[in-house]
Amino acid sequence: MPVIEVRFKGNRREYFTPPPPAELADPLRLEDAVIVEVERGQDLGHVTALGDIALKKCARCQGGACGVGEDAAPKVEHRIVRLATEADLRTAGELRVAEEDVRRTTRDKVREHALPMKVSDTEWQWDRRKLTIYFTAEQRVDFRALVRDLAGVFRTRIELRQIGARDEAKRLDGIGRCGRQLCIASWLPEGRPVSLSLAKAQGLSLNPTQISGPCGRLLCCLHYEHDFYVQQRKRFPKEGKTLRTSEGLERVLAIDIFRERVTLRSEAGTTRVVSLDQLQA
């Protein structure tokens, strides 16, 4: 079954079946703007993957539009209706502008209700039948009264969706410490849990302020080279281990996997640096 990946605001991606070929003058292409079926109404997005690539990405998704494992056949419930027109794109652009006022109004209402939550982003569905409000909070929030209030203001179905710090960064985008676009917003499919042990294994600073991203969480990129460090460290003696060498008993103070060197300290307190080959000879 053909599957097409479509991107919406905030890097949100879902999967759809294409319309019958007879309904399209030309085949769908990447970045085509399309009108799609959603649970209640229609929305506008842009094509980001086609063919086998889209099928594999859909099969890998967990808890998303497919909700299936990688080895299972993907199940897609909605379809692409048609290509978007210039009028459709103008409508979408007007909604993006209107969302700024929606966010300000929602923040005012949150303060009125004294709720412990931060409004991150708002997203109108293209046909204005639904308004999704994304927020972060340290705990569960009872926002039922807020939803009723907002529904009265905007005269549409309101969905409040709590997201995590990394999901917020994915929606809002930004520039990382490296000076490039955030990985989570550009190419990284999903953020994996990151712990200080990853930084420790790579010999990085354990100060969270130096290894955290704009979201306030540890950098996703700590995963990228971790496997390399783990494999390389297997070639070296553990730091703190006492070895019997040609100089007698010496303790491993530090290792340098790039220069392939080991720093040793003897029982007499003298320190020397030897190559890994020399140590293993």
Descriptions of predicted regions:
Residues 174-245, 250-253:
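Conserved glycine-centered short motifs in functionally critical loops
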Residues 132, 251, 261-263:
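General beta-strand recognition
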Residues 11, 245-248, 267-269:
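Glycine-centered tight beta-turn/hairpin loop motif at sheet-sheet or coil-to-beta transitions
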Residues 256-273:
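Basic/aromatic-rich interaction segments and small domains that mediate binding to polyanionic partners
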Residues 1-205, 210:
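Acidic-enriched and Gly/Ser
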Residues 14-16, 269-280:
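A short macromolecule-binding patch
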Residues 39-40, 112, 167-169, 222, ...:
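Hydrophobic/basic alpha-helical segments enriched in Actinobacteria
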Residues 1-2, 28-30, 236-239, 256-260:
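A short, compositionally biased
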